[in-house]
Amino acid sequence: MLDVNKFEYMKIGLASPEKIRSWSYGEVKKPETINYRTLKPEKDGLFCERIFGPTKDWECHCGKYKRVRYKGVVCDRCGVEVTRSKVRRERMGHIELAAPVSHIWYFKGIPSRMGLVLDMSPRALEEVIYFASYVVTDPGDTPLEKKQLLSEKEYRAYREKYGQSFQASMGAEAIKKLLQDIDLDKEVATLKEELKTAQGQRRARIIKRLEVLESFRSSGNDPAWMVLDVLPVIPPELRPMVQLDGGRFATSDLNDLYRRVINRNNRLKRLLDLGAPNIIVQNEKRMLQEAVDALIDNGRRGRPVTGPGNRPLKSLSHMLKGKQGRFRQNLLGKRVDYSGRSVIVVGPNLKMYQCGLPKEMALELFKPFVMKELVERGLAHNIKSAKRKIERVHPEVWDVLEDVIKEHPVLLNRAPTLHRLGIQAFEPTLVEGRAIRLHPLVCTAYNADFDGDQMAVHVPLSAEAQAEARLLMLAAQNILNPKDGKPVVTPSQDMVLGNYYLTMEREGAIGEGMVFKDTDEALLAYHNGYVHLHSRIAIHAGSLKNETFTPEQNNKLLLTTVGKLIFNEILPKSFPYINEPTTENIEGRTPDKYFLDKGVDVREEIRKRELVPPFKKKVLGQIIAEVFKRFKITETSKMLDRMKDLGFQYSTKAGITIGVSDIVVLPEKQEILDEAQAKVDTVLKQFRRGLITDEERYERVISVWSAAKDKIQDRLMKSLDKRNPIFMMSDSGARGNASNFTQLAGMRGLMANPAGRIIELPIKSSFREGLTVLEYFISTHGARKGLADTALKTADSGYLTRRLVDVAQDVIVREEDCGTDRGILARALTDGTEVVVKLEERLVGRYAHKTVHHPETGEVIVRKDEMITEDIANEIIKAGITEVWIRSVFACNTRHGVCKKCYGRNMATGMDVEVGEAVGIIAAQSIGEPGTQLTMRTFHTGGVAGDDITQGLPRVQELFEARNPKGQAVISEIDGTVVAINETRDNQYEIVVQSEVETRSYVAPYNARLKVEEGQHVERGQELTEGSVDPKQLLRVRDITSVQEYLLREVQKVYRMQGVEISDKHIEVMVRQMLRKVRVIDAGDTDVLPGTLLDVHQFTDVNAQAIREGKRPATARPVLLGITKASLETDSFLSAASFQETTRVLTDAAIKGKRDELLGLKENVIIGKLVPAGTGMARYRNVKPAVKKETASDTVPSN
């Protein structure tokens, strides 16, 4: 057996007739498949056992030899070799064609490879191949030219005139003869000469021809092999025929297609033997050609061959193409054993690293392990009896199962898996029932809820797989979100509400002002009803044994509440005591104002003070992030579990409910509405008098109603009782927000019509009062559009993720340091005056490229090549520095990936990135996963001259595909001054920019908004009008750096507008992949052809070689490719073919004789090799896991 992990590379090429015959185990001569009576394969037919091997293991066709002992014997009666039946999956046959046939991929593809080799147009080729015209193959001494086309009539005339002194023929044989006559070296040499002088269209054609001829020359493929003499027949198990219940047969379409080929081939042989008239033979040859075309790629030329019910038959090409094709269905998406799925329910009592597995499911999943253990313990004599015991569910089986699943993590996955947190490992605990129990805190990462979601379970089998699951994938390890490095396991809903309720303060609650000696005493008083959870009390600070208190503070009384005492119990002892939800308290220490000297009148102090707000969801997030920063994973996951338990416990105790009476309607609502109506009437009067335009009237009416709604919202929020359950829910961040509340109690406000334009009649009622029929009808537009949009968006966002993954899948951290001398100058990303991404956010987790000094004191804040942490970043900001040179993926020199220093911190762990991390995939997931949160609509911005500027998901696609944007801005191509802005006759602006050398004028449409004025200095690439810049134009006018910055800024802008934070480095990885190619302009003395796309590294290699040999190097310009284009241009043909345009990619690769070096992840998944990332890298290959018996406390955080 081939060891897949020993592969160096994979090569594809054209097969010669000899090669096809050498693969074959025999010739298929008959179109028959199987005998309908005996159901055995017919001899010499498409399923023949003599050619393809026996249908039953170790049994020949006639039954003379049965049993393993005859292994390898060839039966003397039927000629079948006695062997395993699975050879029918690998043995090929062949058909000897009676006439050569052209291969449709090479003749019909775009560009036609055959046409380029022969320098004939595809139309001319088609006429020859399908027997419509003759082609001159050898003009002899006649005035005819080689490759000249002759119609039937002309051919006859020339035959009469010149007799046999020239040769012309039709069909694929003629083409084959022409292909055989080609001298590649000579042809290439003449073309290179012509290229020196050629211009325009002719030059482009020569370059294209040169490319194809060079590929043939260097790959060792013979152009004549594009015409087939022998047709391979694929193994029968790959085109099976199965019997259905009713005695009928279902068969693969390929068998029909092969049958047609064999039938026509045999008929042609017979006609040739009979010496039939030329016209009949030609017709039969044409039909054979068409049959082979249909077999290879049905429907590529003319109407597809159809089966019953007018369904086009699936040919060999269709077997590879598309989502259901071989690549995506079977090679990239395999089904796996040892897996199961079930509905999920919440498991509130689980630990962070646990999940509940239903007993019956666990028994089935761990069956082999349980059987082994049963035999080892002597509870069963052999494997068979062990299996029987399990099937009959003996009581002792459960005890064994309990022991087997200890320490054996399982993987849980929820579809759609949008990012790496969609698959995590848990330690299973057995539960009754048939539902999987899931820890509530991991729901956010999975985006799971318990309304009927299902999840899949997978069992890692080998010791290595288990170790990886435990060390890398355990849910307790995945606390941070890879896209921004913020905790993803924040409590939600009930847990937030419980902790909010727990940390509330209330005036005049029972027991206010009591002083306790320690926590136990306070809790005793609380449990016995002497003091309320929300009462402000004092406690002896020293008794809390908090390590952040100073000695003076320890001698004082701490002003707090019972609830906060309980809350602080869950935090590590060396963490500040959190008494107020402020950053100073969480990141620094408890403020001094809460410490009272002993002997002070506590009640008086309390009366003087404001109430401290309770801890909301955001604050809990901050606490988790800070605990993680200081104490790392184990401590954080323990604390999260405790926070979850507290939350559930106290939201239960709080008994917070909702009733209609909680929705209080605002008394002054009518007043506000009447006021707004009066304003609207005034606007209408102005419009009727012609003082304002219709558009202005519309804008003003909308703004009046919006203002009215905002006013109602403000009043409502102010008038609400702080203990109103609905207010508590929305304020804590558990559920709902102010706008939901306004719609319940205030007014619903303005709605949009199906086209997205706002209807100027607002909905004045609230849900509490009830809507009128018209109001209800208006509101249905928005609701329906929302649902339709969501459905469309999911598909679009998924496709974007797929393209992103494809373009970046081979970006892996390959080395420690690439030694680059470049970096990028990081400033805050701004859009006009608005800051999109702050400077500190861009700096954290990066390496400095140059040493940063304090501008005043001159002391070193961070040295060159040192990691910038949160604290250093804050120092840089405090020092007033606005720009810093940092290492960036953009400037990384590593081939096929990035280096540790240029990438910086791994957002998912908060540590340095490891060599082997698949950062490309992480980047793709981080950008794709929030895609569903982005809006679909194109906004109408601005007043009358409002042009559509794409936003949301379509804008992200536009940027990554490097398309010409909608609402394109005009940019200046030179540095200079705007000397004039004129209006032309046809209502356009003409902007004239003048530099010292030249003057350029730009035309902008009349409704464009200008961004410059006369006399202003502009730089190359600066926008003259508002709108989106075309990145390709920017690259042409300026340089790579400005394009990188522009794309980074624009993508960030879209995501930040929706409140999604993504780390810069993910977008940088993508943009770098879009800019990795250059187009050769002048080849110099090198072998590259002008106009070809080369990888930047290949280009530098070629030039370095030329300079070493003293030749003139080539010149090239950088190109920006969209992500689809960039994925198809990758060096790996396996990766490109499994992405899109499969046939085109494979045709091209075969002619070039491409080698796939298997550097990316996708190629390795396809051939079944370990991926060269993470633990699959060569450097980790030889690490063997050692099993040591360990106690539970070694591996799992215990409580």
Swiss-Prot record:
Free-text comment on the cofactor: Binds 1 Mg(2+) ion per subunit. Binds 2 Zn(2+) ions per subunit.
Cofactor: Mg(2+); Zn(2+)
Gene Ontology MF annotations: DNA binding; DNA-directed RNA polymerase activity; magnesium ion binding; zinc ion binding
Keyword line: DNA-directed RNA polymerase, Magnesium, Metal-binding, Nucleotidyltransferase, Transcription, Transferase, Zinc
Binding site for Zn(2+) 1: 60, 62, 75, 78
BP term (GO), one: DNA-templated transcription
Reactions catalysed, as given in the entry: RNA(n) + a ribonucleoside 5'-triphosphate = RNA(n+1) + diphosphate
Binding site for Mg(2+): 449, 451, 453
Keyword Magnesium assigned: yes
The keyword Transcription is assigned to this record: yes
GO CC, any one term: DNA-directed RNA polymerase complex
InterPro entries: DNA-dir_RpoC_beta_prime (IPR045867), DNA-dir_RpoC_beta_prime_bact (IPR012754), RNA_pol_asu (IPR000722), RNA_pol_N (IPR006592), RNA_pol_Rpb1_1 (IPR007080), RNA_pol_Rpb1_3 (IPR007066), RNA_pol_Rpb1_3_sf (IPR042102), RNA_pol_Rpb1_4 (IPR007083)
Binding of Zn(2+) 2, residues: 818, 892, 899, 902
Alphabetized SUPFAM superfamilies for the sequence: beta and beta-prime subunits of DNA dependent RNA-polymerase (SSF64484)
Gene3D superfamilies named in the record: 1.10.132.30, 1.10.150.390, 1.10.1790.20, 1.10.40.90, 2.40.40.20, 2.40.50.100, RNA polymerase II, clamp domain, RNA polymerase Rpb1, domain 3
Enzyme Commission identifier(s): 2.7.7.6
Coiled-coil portions: none
A Pfam entry, by short name: RNA_pol_Rpb1_4
Membership in a protein family: Belongs to the RNA polymerase beta' chain family.
Purpose: DNA-dependent RNA polymerase catalyzes the transcription of DNA into RNA using the four ribonucleoside triphosphates as substrates.
Subunit organization: The RNAP catalytic core consists of 2 alpha, 1 beta, 1 beta' and 1 omega subunit. When a sigma factor is associated with the core the holoenzyme is formed, which can initiate transcription.
NCBIfam families: rpoC_TIGR
Protein name: DNA-directed RNA polymerase subunit beta'
Organism: Geobacillus thermodenitrificans (strain NG80-2)
The encoding gene: rpoC
